[in-house]
């Protein structure tokens, strides 16, 4: 699997395209903004998008959805606990930015559910704290975790937004993510990649 990173939107959000190099099938994680850039990249390289995965519903992770879905009729997955945030401009913080945006077309997954996308077995891990329905996506075979705004390089997500909880977030990282193998590569929603082993040893917030 090849993972391509795009830093998009005013908040510098990491959007990922994970590609099966054998057949060009791919899925996207957190299309933050500028969907034309993503669509052009997919189209010119002959990739076949299968789905979008959302780690949570904050505006800076979802505002590229509408443009992307105009090009591709593909499902969008989020954790079921995140429905209220996706459907509220106040909760997803877009109203605070002056342009209210909501998304009601998600398919809702459950904690522990396995999504099969192009041969990749992707486990949904509920990691509340940054938002009540935030989640991470783990691909055991590839040793890869898409952590959204739950876990960053030497940091963790903010908890001062609606439905956030610092105690929940620390517990999510310690009890759900730090049980993964140390060599697991972490692709976060902002900043640089890291690993579970590095964060267990050096992250000052957990």
Regions found by a protein language model. Give the residues of each.
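Short Gly/Pro-enriched turn/cap motifs at secondary-structure boundaries
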Residues: 6-7, 104-106, 126-128
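Residue-level detector of beta-strand structural context in well-folded domains
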Residues: 16, 107, 112-113, 135, ...
């Amino acid at each position: 699997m090849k993972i391509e990173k795009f830093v998009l939107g005013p908040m510098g959000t990491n959007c990922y395209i994970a590609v099966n190099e054998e057949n060009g099938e791919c899925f996207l994680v957190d299309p933050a903004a500028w969907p034309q850039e993503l669509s052009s990249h997919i189209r010119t390289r002959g990739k076949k998008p299968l789905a979008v995965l959302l780690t949570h519903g904050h505006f800076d992770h979802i505002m590229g959805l509408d443009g992307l879905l105009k090009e591709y009729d593909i499902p969008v997955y989020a954790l079921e606990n995140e429905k209220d945030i996706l459907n509220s401009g106040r909760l997803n913080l877009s109203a605070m930015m002056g342009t209210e945006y909501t998304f009601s077309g998600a398919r809702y997954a459950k904690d522990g559910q396995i999504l099969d996308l192009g041969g990749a077995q992707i486990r949904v891990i509920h990691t509340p704290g940054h938002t009540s329905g935030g989640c991470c996506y783990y691909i055991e075979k590839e040793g890869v975790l898409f952590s959204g705004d739950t876990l960053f390089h030497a940091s963790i997500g903010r908890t001062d937004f609606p439905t956030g909880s610092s105690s929940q977030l620390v517990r999510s990282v310690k009890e759900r993510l730090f049980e993964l193998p140390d060599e697991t590569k972490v692709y976060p929603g902002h900043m640089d990649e890291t690993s579970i082993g590095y964060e267990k040893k050096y992250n000052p917030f957990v």
